[in-house]
Amino acid sequence: RMAEELLLSAVRGEGKEHGGKVVRLVFFTFCEDNREYQLQRSFLEQWVDDHFVSPRPVLSLVAQKPLVGELVMEVHSLPATAGEEVTVEEQMTSSVRYLRVTSGHYREIIAGGLYADDLTLPVREQSEQVFGKAEEILKAEQMSFGDIVRQWNYLERITDIVYGNQCYQDFNDIRSQFYASSE
């Protein structure tokens, strides 16, 4: 119920002077396990599909309980611009939906919620899948990892040691590998 109220506020605010075009929704909430994460994510994705017209905002669900409350929603929007035409297009690779924002000589790619197909895999394999999806988007847009301006990653139990490796180190090794490909 709380998620639906938050989502409705984003839909109501879209297109208004203060809001603009909603391009990304980021939710923070506690998830008991991967099953609950996938259920909540599926609910949110379906809700966005049902209530927004194309181009629909991309969605991220961060399994981290907010300091206050049970659910927090962060809304990213593009303000309406006077005299400058901004185009937001919904794009799809074989596995990921993302947005392409263009204006004059400017182009921005907005993706969200990239996650591994199997959340039970070790961090190294999940990281390879996620960065592979990011690479797929970048190649479709004729870009490279060197073109990324802002990237935010959430790793569950980042300091855990699994199979003798720290989760963060495994993630960082894969990230470095993909970023090195654009040097």
Write out the residue ranges for each language-model feature.
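Short, polar/acidic, helix-capping and beta-turn segments at strand->helix junctions
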Residues: 1-183
